[in-house]
Amino acid sequence: MDFDNEDCFDTGWTLHIDADSIIFAQCCIFNDDSDVDRHRITQGVRRRVLELTLDAGCDAAICFLTTSTNFRDDMVDDYKANRDADKKPKPINLAWAKRWTARNLTCIFKNKLEADDLLGIWSGGNSIIWSIDKDLRQIPGKHLDDSTRKVVMITEEGILKDLGKKVYFDGLAGFYYQCLTGDSTDYIVGCGKRIPKVYKSGAKKGQAYISRSGVGPQAAVQIILQAYMARGDSKANMLQAVRDEYQRLHGADWQEHLETQANLLFMVREMHEGRFIKRWTHDDREEYFDLVEGVISNDYTPPATEDGRDT
């Protein structure tokens, strides 16, 4: 597929694409170490990017990529640790395909940051976000919904819906919901604790395993929705409800636990001088994480002239 003159919408909007999933999907299909498969991967990536750009009604697209390093590994020792337990071999052409995409399409990537974080940093303005990752829905603004191929608006407050077997969430409501439940995909415990246990019966009898004890999905939905619908500021009410649960579980150490879990889940929105990212804090205090040193920088002040997108 190629653009022609009739394809040019002249809208001034740019589609910001989480390209990791596009590249991975193509590499899973064409997984032979051959020039033929690599050519097919490039065709598939180009086609998908153009299709999404057309669906969003945008004039241009920027692909965002994840590198092999992540600042969250500097925060905790077990980020995504569950993925290492039964790690499958990566598609043989994956690294090559990422390099090709970076060299041949308009791309943004940064060591220590995921594509999700970069999408957060570059959000706003005349941009629309596309991603199949549920976590990106915490970023307010226009998103291209993958299932309907329609552009939808996510508000800052967000929404939370109990759909029975699944929970739909976005915006701050979704972020606070995840602060309570954690994210088992990335081994984020949320408002909970990991407890060593042993199977007492069955085929695994005697084997050790780790169980999470804490706020579960149904309880989290009730807590957040009750706070959301209470009188007053819904954003402040939801935040206080999350604070209360962490205080109940962790006592005097609640703030450290809350901010650690929140920053594992939070999509970065601000970066300065190519290394200092603004952290989420429960009381809105200014605090930055140094990507180079891998530590919180307590005395950093961003230059007044920067816009928070310096990569």
What are these regions (language model features)?
Residues 1-96:
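Domain-level signal for Mg2+-assisted phosphodiester chemistry and nucleotide/NA-binding surfaces
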Residues 2, 7, 58, 82-310:
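Extended two-metal-dependent nuclease catalytic cores across DNA- and RNA-processing enzymes
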